[in-house]
Regions:
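Aromatic-anchored transmembrane helix interface
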Residues: 66-82, 91-125, 140, 146, ...
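A membrane-periplasm/extracellular boundary helix in multi-pass inner-membrane enzymes
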Residues: 215, 236-278, 292-299
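Hydrophobic transmembrane alpha-helices and their immediate junctions
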Residues: 243-246, 347-381
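Long extracytoplasmic/lumenal interhelical loops at the membrane interface
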Residues: 281-285, 305-348
Length: 423
């Protein structure tokens, strides 16, 4: 009797956690504070569920080997960031305002990465207990949240000075990454649905996500959204994609529409490349200058721990020496290195680089060993693409949303007997 009550309680807790995470994702882009509190509650429940499973010997380490490995490397990644933030906070006696913001983001982000790793492991182990009703409620919350977010985004675009919407974040790029990760969670949860009306919801969410990313004006997230969507289609409908010309034609048509609707941003990018010799103070030129400053900093500091102010000072000296007219790069280098690996290496050294590489290597190893990680691949692909031209994880908001989406993408349960396909 006691065991039955425990199992029912565990099932209830896991289903509550999924709904709570979806609620947090749905609120995150227009409400501040509450989504983070929900995340903390779910993380504490997740820690308790894992301890319960270990104590009762109900954790199958062999079956969950990949997710245990992913949990371990995420813990290592978070601990290195946490140790760096505490260390730098102690030795930097007079940090600038930007440095304090940077350190604070890393410190809070590292704590949430640690807690998020437990949420991920809990849903990976107990995801089979999640009911179809729970998934439908969760997807409904995300759908409503995205629609409300679009309303706030349109209002901000029309009635404020922000041409690129920021919503609840400090930068448009941060908002776009968070929206991308929310879309990844939606895609994975849609895999377990059979009813045709949810396919209409899939189209609505695709359109809303695209509209939000368009309003954010971040090119790389549009590329990432297309890549993530293609990966999901290949995972889910690969036979139809190969054999059904109508689905293939529809896919090509959607891609063409997306490219045409964002053509102005691609034209700007091409103009930046063409005019780079005469005007390097552009979005592209700034990145080239910042990357050069980052590489120069790494070469001179041997890949050890460094303070944000030291990095900014030396990178600006490099930019002034090699790109004296690049005002954009000189200004923005104080925020981050606009590349995930360069960002980590310049601050946490080669130890930080290794911890980030371990996450990708773990996923790659799982792919080679044919582990069931199709859900995990979606946000990881989005993070990798976005991280090529920007720093995503230093900001505590994006790190939190990434971990929530990644955790939801770890849910594994039997696929429905009948799936909706196009004949």
């Amino acid at each position: 009797m006691t065991n039955k009550i425990s199992r029912n309680g565990l099932t209830l807790m896991v289903n509550f956690s999924v709904i709570a995470l979806c609620l947090a994702l749905s609120l995150n882009m227009f409400v501040t504070g509450l989504p983070q509190k929900i995340f903390y509650l779910v993380s504490y429940l997740s820690v308790a569920s894992i301890l319960y499973g270990v104590a009762r010997r109900r954790v199958d380490f062999k079956e969950n080997g990949f997710y245990l490995a992913l949990f371990a490397v995420l813990i290592i990644f978070a601990l290195i960031r946490l140790f760096w933030a505490i260390h730098v906070k102690g030795i930097d006696t007079a940090p600038s305002t930007d440095a304090m913001t940077n350190i604070g983001n890393y410190l809070l982000g590292a704590k949430r990465l640690l807690l998020g790793a437990f949420v991920l492991l809990s849903l990976a182990i107990y995801g089979h207990r999640v009911s179809t009703t729970t998934l439908r409620i969760g997807r409904g919350l995300i759908l409503v949240g995205l629609l409300i977010t679009l309303g706030f985004g349109i209002h901000e675009h029309l009635y404020t000075e922000n041409i690129r919407i920021k919503l609840t974040t400090e930068a448009a790029s941060m908002s776009s990454y968070m929206i991308l990760f929310i879309y990844c969670a939606w895609l994975w949860l849609s895999r377990f649905e059979t009813h045709a009306y949810w396919k209409v919801a899939d189209v609505v969410v695709l359109a809303v996500t695209f509209a939000l990313l368009y309003l954010c004006g971040t090119r790389v997230t549009l590329i990432a959204m297309i890549a993530v969507g293609l990966l999901f289609l290949v995972q889910t409908y690969r036979l139809s994609l190969l054999t059904n010309w109508r689905i293939s034609a529809l896919l090509v048509g959607v891609l063409a529409v997306l490219i045409l609707m964002t053509s102005n941003r691609w034209v700007e990018g091409m103009q930046d490349i063409e005019n780079y010799g005469s005007n390097s103070s552009t979005s592209l030129g700034a990145r080239v200058a910042i990357w050069g400053g980052a590489v120069n900093f790494i070469e001179h500091h041997g890949g050890g721990f460094a303070t944000p102010d030291a990095r900014t000072t030396e990178a600006r000296q490099f930019i002034m020496a090699h790109y004296p007219l690049n005002v954009e790069g000189y200004t923005n280098v104080k925020y981050n290195m606009h590349n995930e690996f360069l960002e980590v290496t310049t601050l946490q050294g080669w130890l930080g680089t290794l911890s980030l590489a371990l996450i990708y290597l773990t996923v790659l190893t799982g792919v080679l060993k044919k582990c069931d990680l199709r859900g995990v691949a979606l946000p990881m692909l989005g993070l990798f693409i976005a991280g090529l031209t920007d720093s995503v994880m230093p900001y505590n908001q994006t790190a939190t949303i990434f971990m929530m989406a990644l955790a939801l993408c770890c849910i594994r349960r039997p696929l429905p007997v009948r799936r909706v396909t196009t004949a």
